[in-house]
Amino acid sequence: METKKISYFLLPSLMIVALIFQPMCSAFTIAEPYIHPCMKGFCSFKSECANKCIFMGHHKGGDCIGGLDGIYCCCLA
């Protein structure tokens, strides 16, 4: 039984294709800048939300995000 060898052209070609498609695939992932779950009731002022998140240990603070059922305080990741 005869085994076929991978050509010296095919392997580098596949590596180049993989290096091209990897950044393209990673560009389609959605990066969420907020830590979930968001908290309801801390958005009377934006600074109130930021202070609450800093108190919880999230050093970047927080932001008020409006949703269908109210305004939420979401801490920044």
From Swiss-Prot:
GO BP terms: defense response to fungus; killing of cells of another organism
Main location: secreted
Signal peptide from the UniProt entry: 1-27
CC terms in the record's Gene Ontology section: extracellular region
Compartments it resides in: Secreted
Keywords assigned: Antimicrobial, Disulfide bond, Fungicide, Plant defense, Secreted, Signal
Intrachain S-S bonds: 38-75, 43-64, 49-73, 53-74
KW Signal (keyword) present: yes
Family membership noted in the UniProt record: Belongs to the DEFL family.
Protein name in the entry: Defensin-like protein 91
Organism: Arabidopsis thaliana (Mouse-ear cress)
Taxonomic lineage of the native organism: Eukaryota, Viridiplantae, Streptophyta, Embryophyta, Tracheophyta
